[in-house]
Structures are given as C-alpha cells and as structure tokens.
C-alpha cells in the first residue's frame, strides 16, 4: 500500500528486456535506506518487488504484462522515475491509499501554465470515467493528486510548484504517457455487490 507522496526521483540505470521476465535497475539513495530484498517500492506508481540491492542501485523483475500495461515499458537509461516505499503501519497518509496496480496509461493532451500552478489535461482511457470525479483522488505516475475538471474523454489535475519540483510531473510534456491509478475507494463503492 502506498499514499502517493513521492520520496525521491530515481534514475533508470538499465532496462534489460528478456522474453518473459525483464529486469529494471534504478539508481536512488533515500528509498534504499532500510530497504531489503522482497520489499515493495512504487516506481512511477507501479508496485514492484526489490529483487537485488547494491550500493545505490536496486533491481526489479518485471513480467511482460507490466511492460505492456504501464509506462515502464517505454523507459530508457537515464529517465527519471518517481519512487515511494510502501506505507508503514502507524505512518501518516498524506495523499490517498494506492495499491500500485495501474488501471491504464493516459496521454497528456495539454499543459497550461497559470500564475501559481499548472494544469495538466489527460486523455481519459475507456472504462475509467466512472472512477474519475471532480475533487476525487487520482494518481499519475504514483503522485497523489486531486481531480480538477472532468470533461468528455479527459480530466485535469493541477500542479503546485512544490509538486513540480519534487516529482517527474514537472518535466512531463504534451504527448507524454502517465500511469493512472484511480481511487480504490471509488472502485469498491461502484463494484460493490456486482458479482456477489
């Protein structure tokens, strides 16, 4: 479980593509403190298990589905990624509850700069509209955000200067892809009793 408060921006050291199981290596410092093999770390919002740790580089194994259904398959050496360690029992939840299971990948359609913030407009992937509501929670690349506007086939979020500085969202451009995880509470409420 995560809460969408990015602890560190890491750097992709390598993405070794293999037939069924690819290996991602990420360079970081802060999130490695106290981290051991088997721990979960969200990489751009995707929950991955640490399989190896050396100095300032940690390694993950990724199934083909992870590469195909998230933006991680588009990563290249030197790319920046948002990192967050799993929540600790008794810790604060400053964002919202997130599982690290990505619902879809969306594309940034527009980036508008205002005096004190920026608005990102994201193309809404099919089937997610019912989970995206104004003032509701959504995660983009592992960053907990509040939905600003919802329109036909798109939604917007607002980025304050701090969020732009401490996450990769500050450097995203029109046309870039982002991992989307909708609010887990909305999923449970809307799906309650469907198959019971």
Stretches with model-predicted labels:
Residues 1-196:
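Conserved loop->alpha-helix
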């Amino acid at each position: 479980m995560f809460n969408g408060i990015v602890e560190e921006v890491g750097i992709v050291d390598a993405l070794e593509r293999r037939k069924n199981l690819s290996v991602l290596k990420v360079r970081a410092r802060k999130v490695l403190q106290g981290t051991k093999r088997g721990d979960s770390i969200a990489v751009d919002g995707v929950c991955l298990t640490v399989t190896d740790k050396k100095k300032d580089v940690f390694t993950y194994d990724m199934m083909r589905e992870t590469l195909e259904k998230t933006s991680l398959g588009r990563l290249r050496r030197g790319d920046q990624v948002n990192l967050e360690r799993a929540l600790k029992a008794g810790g604060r939840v400053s964002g919202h509850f997130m599982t690290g299971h990505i619902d879809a990948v969306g594309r940034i359609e527009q980036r508008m700069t205002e005096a004190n913030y920026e608005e990102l407009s994201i193309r809404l992937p099919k089937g997610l509209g019912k989970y995206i509501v104004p003032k509701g929670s959504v995660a983009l690349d592992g960053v907990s955000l509040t939905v600003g506007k919802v329109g036909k086939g798109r939604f917007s979020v607002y980025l304050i200067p701090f969020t732009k500085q401490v996450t990769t969202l500050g450097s995203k451009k029109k046309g870039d892809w982002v991992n989307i995880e909708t609010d887990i509470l909305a999923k449970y409420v809307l799906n309650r009793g469907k198959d019971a």
